A protein has these predicted regions:
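Hydrophobic membrane-insertion alpha-helices, especially the h-region
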Residues: 1-5
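N-terminal "domain-start" segment that seeds a small globular fold
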Residues: 8-44
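Conserved helix-turn-beta segment immediately C-terminal to the redox Cys motif
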Residues: 10, 68-89
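Short active-site neighborhood of thiol/selenol oxidoreductases, capturing the structured segment around
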Residues: 43-71
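Structural beta-sheet core signal
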Residues: 54, 87-89, 141
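Structural motif
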Residues: 56-58, 90-94
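Short, internal strand/loop/helix patches
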Residues: 86-88, 95, 99-137
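Thiol-/selenol-based redox modules, centered on thioredoxin-like
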Residues: 135-175
């Protein structure tokens, strides 16, 4: 463990996680938004549970739907630990119709959906490299303390997410 603090980019050869660890973890900044259900959300809304986050700019296209489906299946695969995990879509919805919003809510029940009207400070936490967070198509994992700690690329297999989460939920007393 000491080596990780001294050399944060180093990973042992036997590292078995499928996602990319975010080192150091990034705490989510304070935020205040309203989800599609009209409920106020802030940073405490994401505390106490592991949260799979997907950021989308504009209409939810085929890849967006596939990612949301994968996230839902990953959560369902957690069995008895399903209640320790939640899903969040942060959606820059410039011009997206109410019908599209309603369709997303219908197809992905229980999915927290938060529309953005501007580049919120929350989104900047997800900026990991030269790719803009709203167009990177990644799935991000936020821990129950409100820290961004891992991400998955668009072509990563959901089975890897399932295995990582099974391990995290098994060995973590959080969430």
């Amino acid at each position: 463990i000491l080596l990780i603090f001294i050399f944060p980019d180093w990973r042992p050869a036997g590292s078995s996680n499928h996602g990319q660890l975010v080192t150091p973890v990034r705490p989510l900044p304070p935020f205040q938004m309203e989800n599609l259900a009209g409920e106020q959300m802030d940073e405490t809304s994401l505390r106490g549970k592991w949260t799979l986050v997907y950021l989308q700019q504009g209409a939810c296209d085929k890849l967006c739907v596939e990612q949301l489906y994968s996230i839902r299946q990953v959560r369902l695969a957690q069995g008895k630990n399903i209640d320790r995990l939640q899903r969040l879509l942060v959606w820059e919805n410039g011009g997206v119709s109410r019908e599209d919003q309603a369709e997303l809510q219908q197809h992905f029940p229980g999915q927290l959906i938060v529309p953005l009207t501007d580049q919120h400070a929350l989104v900047q936490v997800f900026s990991l490299d030269e790719q803009k967070p709203m167009t990177a198509r990644r799935v991000y994992l936020v821990d129950p303390l409100g820290n961004l700690m891992m991400h998955y690329e668009p072509d990563d297999e959901p089975k890897g997410m399932i295995k990582d989460l099974e391990r995290l939920l098994k060995y973590s007393g959080l969430g």
